[in-house]
Amino acid sequence: MSNHDPLTLKLSLREKCAYGVGDFGSNLMLCIGTLYLLKFYTDELGMPAYYGGIIFLVAKFFTAFTDMLTGVLLDSRRNIGAKGKFRPFILYASFPVALVATAQFFATHFTLPVKTAFATVLFMLFGLFYSLMNCSYGAMVPAITKNPHERAQLAAWRQGGATIGLLLCTVGFMPIQALFTRSPSLGYLIAAVIFSVCGLFSMWWCFSGVKERYIETVPDTHKPSILKSFCAIFRNPPLLVLCVANLCTLAAFNIKLAIQVYYTQYVLNDIHLLSWMGFFSMGCILIGVLLVPAAVKRFGKKQVYLGGLILWAVGDILNFIWGGTSFLFVIFSCIAFFGTAFVNSLNWALVPDTVDYGEWKTGIRAEGSVYTGYTFSRKISAALAGFLPGIMLTQIGYIPNIAQSDTTLLGLRQLIFLWPCGLAIIAALTMGFFYKLNEQRFAFIIEEIAQRKKTGNQIVATNNKQSISTVNN
């Protein structure tokens, strides 16, 4: 335990940067699959689009439960060594993540059923190792700092790293692949190798640069389990609301990313626009991320979150109505992606607060269970986001590498704009009406937890009617 006041302890710039580099590396390995794996399946492996959707659905549901298992593993740890409670998983799981991320782009010449089975197994393996690495990375924040402003800073650095990783994937992957005109499938593989190796070294940088200061083990009387991780969502109202909102926002964001490569190629007839659009829109996200700490300090997390959702919805509506040219598409996309910067950053800043809420309410601090309960909702969202584009591409009549019909073009416009817009509006209504954990209540919770530890009082807060009345009124 640090001798500094946990609520005022400041982190070094070097440590914040190292933490941000972690999600940079994580996204380099994740986003090559999010952005291009469906297109690789359809165009190089010859799979029907709905096959890809089913693969994503099955594998993401599987990894939703591996996230839960990771939480159980983290909370079950008792003999914690010098590397800490979470950091060893970042170090050791990152190598198989990079290896499988690359292997997913290996073009086989088997029959379609064998190709499908092979792709499904690889995607599930990627999800398993990614759960071990990324859940540990995210659950580590409460162990790094208890200062809410520093948590917002870490969330901003994390989202900044993720944005730069996504930007590089958007701008750099297809140009590398396009260099191999005689063997497009080899181009996919080489690009995947480059991004995965960079991601691996970034995760190792993160491991070496961050410090766990507040390592607490779960009491022996509390036996972690998948059921308890799942129940942690429903026993923690702020976490439940955040999970529902995140279910909408992550699905919206991933649908947009999955469809944009089809939209630029077939609606705007300019596949090279994808790199420019990625450069400008991800640049807007990066600017938004840099503004998050100041905006949160002035307006509070909830208000900034809602403002980001409104910008997102407005940008998508404008794009659906007037985004028929490349220039307007980029402009309106920048508005929408600028809004997503605040939303995606604060998703991560709000989760550690719910960890403290859970400790205040139950007397048990279980970062792993809370965080993986949250990531369970994210994986369900990602499963739907991976499933829907593949199914919808089939429903609207998409056929690879030919001119698309007017019905198909309209379907692409609806998929990339109206679906994300609708989901953003649902998320805004959910957070606006049901999320109650503001800055004042959070400060009260932290103070009461500290007082309990000082006095050795282990009374569970749910039995303290006076405390509950103070927070809820």
UniProtKB/Swiss-Prot annotation:
Which residues span the membrane?
18-38, 45-65, 88-108, 110-130, 160-180, 187-207, 239-259, 276-296, 317-337, 380-400, 415-435
- Which PROSITE patterns does the record match to this protein? NA_GALACTOSIDE_SYMP
Q: Where in the cell is it found?
A: Cell inner membrane
Any one Gene Ontology BP term: transmembrane transport
* Gene3D superfamilies per record: MFS general substrate transporter like domains
Instruction: Mention any Pfam family matching this sequence.
Output: MFS_2
Q: Name one GO molecular function term.
A: symporter activity
Keywords, A to Z?
Cell inner membrane, Cell membrane, Membrane, Symport, Transmembrane, Transmembrane helix, Transport
Looking up PANTHER family in the UniProt record yields:
MAJOR FACILITATOR SUPERFAMILY DOMAIN-CONTAINING PROTEIN, SULFOQUINOVOSE IMPORTER-RELATED
Q: Which family does it belong to?
A: Belongs to the sodium:galactoside symporter (TC 2.A.2) family.
User: What protein is this chain from?
Assistant: Putative sulfoquinovose importer
Please give the organism.
Answer: Salmonella typhimurium (strain LT2 / SGSC1412 / ATCC 700720)
**Source organism lineage?**
Bacteria, Pseudomonadati, Pseudomonadota, Gammaproteobacteria, Enterobacterales
